[in-house]
Each structure stands twice: as structure tokens, then as C-alpha cells.
């Protein structure tokens, strides 16, 4: 498991606890928030890894770094499944190109690991339990049936009480159009910043 919200995020901790019902869970996640870092890898400085607990590791890098290190250095073997999340906030439309959460699942797929990202469509008052239980259902299905080659899933769960999560839809990736506003300010030394 990994994420882009950091090793201390409640989303990854709730998800790890839920996924433990399916087998051994390892977490290799950024040591701090790394949202919107896309699929970047750290190439020009060393990466530090801190073992937090038996199967929990914090990396001072990006989510894609975490997956790369997990597969090639930290874990004793290739995992059966890679799950990235639970992200605080949805990952839809063009935003997936910036998402560390989604990119981590993509990185897993590049290593030949079935993978999915899971995000909670909210900006506050997160209901992680329902999303975690849904992730367990998806994980169980993938472990049993696999995914098509070179395919990963990007799952977005509404932030509603679990009893309202009764069905799912498979959709196509849409577009999100954001404004291009840039806020210019001046620091105390008279220098512009954005």
C-alpha cells in the first residue's frame, strides 16, 4: 500500500486495517504530504527510508518512489496487489495526471502488479470506513480474477454513509476545466511571488 497524503494519513491507516482481512499488508508511503506530485521519481538525491513498524515504512520521496523502492528494495517479494489511498479528495478528470495517488497505482502496473487507487470524494469530514470496505471488495475480486494486462483502476467513492454505497459504475475518464487564475503577491522584501 501507498498514498500521496503521507504515512500518518487516517485514510491509509483505516484502509490497511480493512485490507488485513485478506492477508499480509505492507505500507511504503511518503513521510509527508505529497499531493499533486504526479508520477515523478527522485533521481538527483538519495532517498531515505525509515522503518516505522514491522511492515510500515516511511520514504522521503514521492508515491512513485515508494512503489519503486517497495518492489525493488524493501519488500521481500513482489506484492500480489498494490492499493494506493484512501486519498482525501476525488481524483477525476484531468486531475489524475497530477495525482500522486493515481500515479502510484500506475507505477505498480508498470512493475506488473495488479493495482488500484481509491479516493474519497470530499474535502472534509471524511467517511473512510465505507471506502475501505468497498476497497476490500475490489481487492478480493482482483486477487481472485486479476485485471487485464497493463490496466489499473482509479476508484472514487462518494463521501456518504456506508449504507448508501449500494452500487458502482464503470465510467470513462472525463475532463475537468479549472480556471487559470494566478494570484500575484509581493513579499516583505518587495519581491513578487505566486
Predicted features along the sequence, with ranges:
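Glycine-rich phosphate/pyrophosphate-binding loops
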Residues: 109-131
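Short beta-strand segments
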Residues: 2, 28-30, 60, 84-87, ...
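Hydrophobic/aromatic ligand-binding patch that stacks against planar heteroaromatic rings
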Residues: 104-108
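N-terminal beta1-alpha1 ligand-phosphate binding loop
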Residues: 1-19
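Glycine/threonine-rich flexible loop motifs
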Residues: 90-99
Amino acid at each position: 500500500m501507498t498514498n500521496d497524503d503521507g504515512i500518518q494519513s487516517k485514510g491509509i491507516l483505516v484502509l490497511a486495517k480493512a485490507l488485513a482481512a485478506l492477508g499480509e499488508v505492507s505500507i511504503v508511503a511518503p513521510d509527508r504530504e505529497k499531493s499533486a506530485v504526479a508520477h515523478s521519481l527522485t533521481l538527483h538525491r538519495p532517498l531515505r527510508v525509515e522503518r516505522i513498524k514491522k511492515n510500515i515504512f516511511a520514504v522521503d520521496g514521492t508515491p512513485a518512489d515508494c512503489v519503486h523502492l517497495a518492489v525493488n528494495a524493501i519488500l521481500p517479494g513482489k506484492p500480489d496487489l498494490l492499493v494506493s489511498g484512501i486519498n482525501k479528495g476525488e481524483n477525476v478528470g484531468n486531475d489524475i495526471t497530477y495525482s500522486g495517488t493515481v500515479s502510484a497505482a500506475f507505477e505498480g502496473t508498470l512493475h506488473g502488479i495488479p493495482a488500484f487507487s481509491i479516493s474519497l470524494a470530499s474535502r472534509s469530514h471524511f467517511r473512510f470506513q465505507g471506502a475501505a470496505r468497498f476497497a476490500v471488495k475490489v481487492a478480493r475480486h482482483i486477487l481472485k480474477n486479476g485485471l487485464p494486462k497493463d490496466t489499473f483502476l482509479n476508484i472514487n467513492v462518494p463521501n456518504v454513509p456506508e449504507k448508501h454505497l449500494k452500487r458502482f459504475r464503470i465510467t470513462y475518464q472525463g475532463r475537468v476545466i479549472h480556471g487559470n487564475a494566478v494570484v500575484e503577491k509581493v513579499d516583505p522584501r518587495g519581491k513578487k511571488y505566486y
